[in-house]
């Protein structure tokens, strides 16, 4: 039986096609070296000509244009841009300038508390329970201590720029949630948490 099996294997082995020998990689000339232009993708650090994205897709978060810092959305973040002597303007999303220039008389008395609540949002308030606890200890004791960070982020704390980027992402997310919550409470009549 072993002879029969070995015979079948030998016939199958011998009837198999011979694979071509591996070819060495082609020699790359200096003309073939990259980087090749990719017209559909943004270039890192280059300002886009499209005025809607404000360079958000092509820049890391710590190099975003000064539109957010000039409008006071992130007062705790220091910008690398030179300070402007012009009076900061109220923040508005691109394309919404004309809607905000409506006369003040159109705003009803019922909408005024919501507008005040939106203007008084705590942009630098703690975003997590561990930050809230630390903030109350700071207020009660009167001494300034460094904020605690979640244990899951401790291995990443030594990377330069990671903490700043993460904090920026959390602040923007909190701001977006707060604005959406204020809109929902006005529409649905829900109470703010």
Swiss-Prot record:
Sorted alphabetically, which Pfam families does this protein's record hold? Answer: ANXA2R
Polar residues: compositionally biased ranges: 78-87
Which protein are we looking at? Annexin-2 receptor
In which domain of life is the source organism classified? Eukaryota
TM ranges are none
Spell out the residue ranges making up region: Disordered: 78-111
Instruction: Sum up the protein's function in the record's words.
Output: May act as a receptor for annexin II on marrow stromal cells to induce osteoclast formation.
Molecular function via GO = signaling receptor activity
The record's tissue-specificity note reads:
Widely expressed. Highly expressed in lymphocytes. Expressed in both resting CD4(+) and CD8(+) T-cells.
- Keyword presence, Transferase: no
Q: Which UniProt keywords apply?
A: Receptor
Q: Which InterPro entries match?
A: ANXA2R
Which organism does this record belong to?
Homo sapiens (Human)
UniProt keyword Chaperone, yes or no: no
